């Protein structure tokens, strides 16, 4: 559409008194009806639009008289002249191009396309002019930086230049905000659906099962080492308990022998037997310690070292006890010899008892290993003092 020719046609229309139809301006209205683009501003073609609208309404009434019969009770009846003046007044109040300009131009160029009655045609026109939004011509987008609108009316001002926006809801419609795209955090299957909860539960069960198996294996490996330790400690404690019991028994027997010197021979034999049993048990204890040591060398070094130390201490105790018992037996032998000498001078039965006691002491000398206490070491010393004091009495009798 040539803008220069259009402006010349508008000037000619004004010169002719705004009463004649211009083919060029009718062609302009057809162009707007097809494309919706207004090449010129609204004030320039507003007068011709009003002239064309009034002419079409008059022609429509002459060609199609008003409807006969009673009017529609659901619609307010308005006379033609009143409706015509109302429509022309609303259009004349526009200071900007209404955004329904394309539909209005269609009604002006081809009024009988959709309507046959005058009343319906007027209501269709009224519906399209009851708007407030405006549109801008294509030329105004680039050449008119000082336009403003308020309630569908354009006012010249120092506003910013027009920016391209959609005319569906009219100019000035706020633009939609750009919403961020959210991605699914859950994994997707091949068909595009997220994984089901059953798969997640099965994975969790497998993980828990593997963790429990590893924990049981660790507990079993840790439980084997304390078992070996406890078994070795139990054997050592049993041996120590047995040795203490034998030691306590020997102490009681020796005390009884001191009280009854006639039964010393029997006690000495019993002590010898118990000493042999103790020695055999000690040997067995050593062997068990050695076997436990060889079995637990790799896994339990601490347990084997403790058993070795205890065995060495036990050996040293047995050696010290044997030395003490040898000294005590030597002292007892001397005291018994002195007693035998005194008894020979006094009475023969006493010499026989002394000989029996010396025989018992000789047998006790061969069996070393009896454990004694400090009480036994004190009793022979008292006997020796009595023996030294006994020979003095026969000398006085002589």
From Swiss-Prot:
<feature type="compositionally biased region" description="Polar residues">
    <location>
        <begin position="139"/>
        <end position="149"/>
    </location>
</feature>
<dbReference type="GO" id="GO:0005737">
    <property type="term" value="C:cytoplasm"/>
</dbReference>
<comment type="similarity">
    <text>Belongs to the PPP4R2 family.</text>
</comment>
<dbReference type="GO" id="GO:0005634">
    <property type="term" value="C:nucleus"/>
</dbReference>
<dbReference type="GO" id="GO:0019888">
    <property type="term" value="F:protein phosphatase regulator activity"/>
</dbReference>
<comment type="subunit">
    <text>Serine/threonine-protein phosphatase 4 (PP4) occurs in different assemblies of the catalytic and one or more regulatory subunits.</text>
</comment>
<feature type="compositionally biased region" description="Polar residues">
    <location>
        <begin position="183"/>
        <end position="193"/>
    </location>
</feature>
<protein>
    <recommendedName>
        <fullName>Serine/threonine-protein phosphatase 4 regulatory subunit 2-B</fullName>
    </recommendedName>
</protein>
<dbReference type="InterPro" id="IPR015267">
    <property type="entry name" value="PPP4R2"/>
</dbReference>
<comment type="function">
    <text>Regulatory subunit of serine/threonine-protein phosphatase 4 (PP4).</text>
</comment>
<feature type="compositionally biased region" description="Basic and acidic residues">
    <location>
        <begin position="197"/>
        <end position="211"/>
    </location>
</feature>
<dbReference type="GO" id="GO:0030289">
    <property type="term" value="C:protein phosphatase 4 complex"/>
</dbReference>
<dbReference type="Pfam" id="PF09184">
    <property type="entry name" value="PPP4R2"/>
</dbReference>
<feature type="compositionally biased region" description="Polar residues">
    <location>
        <begin position="156"/>
        <end position="170"/>
    </location>
</feature>
<feature type="compositionally biased region" description="Polar residues">
    <location>
        <begin position="278"/>
        <end position="294"/>
    </location>
</feature>
<feature type="region of interest" description="Disordered">
    <location>
        <begin position="138"/>
        <end position="398"/>
    </location>
</feature>
<feature type="compositionally biased region" description="Low complexity">
    <location>
        <begin position="338"/>
        <end position="366"/>
    </location>
</feature>
């Amino acid at each position: 559409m040539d803008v220069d020719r259009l402006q010349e046609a508008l000037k000619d229309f004004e010169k002719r008194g705004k009463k004649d139809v211009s083919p060029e301006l009718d062609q302009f209205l057809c162009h707007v009806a097809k494309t919706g683009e207004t090449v010129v501003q609204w004030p320039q073609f507003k007068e011709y639009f009003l002239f064309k609208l009034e002419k079409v309404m008059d022609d429509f009434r002459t060609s199609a008289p008003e409807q006969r019969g009673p009017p529609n009770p659901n619609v307010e009846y308005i006379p033609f002249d009143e409706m015509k003046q109302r429509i022309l007044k609303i259009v004349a109040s526009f200071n900007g191009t209404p955004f329904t300009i394309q539909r209005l131009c269609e009604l002006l160029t081809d009024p009988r396309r959709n309507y046959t009655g005058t009343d319906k045609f007027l209501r269709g026109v009224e519906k399209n002019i009851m708007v407030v939004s405006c549109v801008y011509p294509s030329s105004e987008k680039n050449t008119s930086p000082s336009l403003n609108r308020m309630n569908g009316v354009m006012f010249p001002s120092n506003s910013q230049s027009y920016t391209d926006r959609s005319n569906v809801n009219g100019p000035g419609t706020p633009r939609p905000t750009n919403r961020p795209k959210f991605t699914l955090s859950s994994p997707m299957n091949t068909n595009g659906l997220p994984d089901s909860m059953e798969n997640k539960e099965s994975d969790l069960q497998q993980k828990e099962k593997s963790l429990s198996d590893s924990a049981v294996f660790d507990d079993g490996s840790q439980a084997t080492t304390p078992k070996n330790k406890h078994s070795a400690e139990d054997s050592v404690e049993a041996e120590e308990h047995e040795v203490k019991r034998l030691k306590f028994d020997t102490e009681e027997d020796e005390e009884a022998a001191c009280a009854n010197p006639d039964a010393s021979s029997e006690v000495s034999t019993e002590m010898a037997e118990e000493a042999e049993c103790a020695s055999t048990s000690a040997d067995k204890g050593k062997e068990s310690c050695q076997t436990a040591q060889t079995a637990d060398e790799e896994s339990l070094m601490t347990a084997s070292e403790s058993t070795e130390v205890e065995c060495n201490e036990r050996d040293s105790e047995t050696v010290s006890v044997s030395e003490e018992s040898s000294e005590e037996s030597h002292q007892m032998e001397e005291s018994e010899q002195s007693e035998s000498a005194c008894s020979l001078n006094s009475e023969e039965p006493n010499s026989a008892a002394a000989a029996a006691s010396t025989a018992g002491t000789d047998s006790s000398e061969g069996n070393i290993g009896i454990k004694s206490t400090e009480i036994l070491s004190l009793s022979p010393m008292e006997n020796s003092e009595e023996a030294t004091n006994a020979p003095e009495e026969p000398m006085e009798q002589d």
